[in-house]
Amino acid sequence: QQVDQIALQSQRRAALARNQGYFKSIIPVYNPVKDCWVNEDECIRPELGPEDLAQLKPYFAELGATGVDALQLTEHPSLQAISHVHTAGNSPAMADAASLVLLGDKSLQGQGLVPRARILAATTLCNDPLQVVSGCAAATAKLLLDQGLTSADIDLFELHEAFAATSIKCQRDLDIGADRLNVNGGVIALGHPMGATGGIMLGMLIDELERRDLQTGVVATSGAAGIGTALLIERI
């Protein structure tokens, strides 16, 4: 299925980026229990194949049967049926992590700090609450519209891979080619540590803009109940 292909792409891109040393913003953390340094993401599974993902059971089918599916069909009459396609293999990996983003104005330059990028615009909205992770595409679309831009004006997108269908929706709704979206893998491969994912994605985007000598990027995340937040950044 298409969702499984998105998941495999995320895994392979993340593995390649890790092996090539693209995740340069990772700060190693010492693990005293195992007496070792953790210096790379441990969720990446490049060995997975289509046959592995095909064996996994849909995770939300039981929840849908409790009445959630019926509510969706009532609220969205154009839907004829709901197909549960998300499994543990094409959903965000559970992970522990932390992220740090230093924000400031021009006065920081007096502290010997060199800015890497600046935020040009930001948008937060709540879309249809029943479409839980639809906010990512909606927030990005509004951000671009408000700035008089189209997706063609943006060099790279780092959009929250909260379930593979989110990536499919973003590509379709925003007309983004796979060559500009989550180019080093997303949270399906790298993990989704609550409260840290946004900062990690922003760091990944800036790193890749620098590596490719590109200028503009959009980073966006989804939240529950259709919430979405998007940032437009420019490399300095």
Explain the meaning of each model-derived region.
Residues 2-110, 173, 178-180:
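N-terminal extracellular/periplasmic Venus flytrap/periplasmic-binding protein-like
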Residues 2-6, 83-99, 120-146, 159, ...:
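Active-site pocket-shaping loop/turn-to-helix segments
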Residues 2-9, 26-31, 113-124, 152-161, ...:
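Beta-strand segments within the central parallel beta-sheet cores of soluble alpha/beta enzyme folds
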Residues 4, 8-15, 50, 54-57, ...:
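Predominant activation on well-ordered alpha-helical scaffold segments within soluble catalytic domains
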Residues 19, 145-148, 210-211:
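Residue-level signal for alpha-helix termini/capping positions
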Residues 36-39, 43-44, 129-136, 161-179, ...:
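Short glycine/threonine-rich loop-to-helix capping motif typified by GTGT followed
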Residues 79-83, 87-106, 198-236:
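Conserved beta-strand-centric core segments of catalytic alpha/beta enzyme folds
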Residues 109-113, 141-156, 174-177:
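Phosphate/pyrophosphate-binding loops at sites that engage ATP/ADP/AMP, CoA/4′-phosphopantetheine
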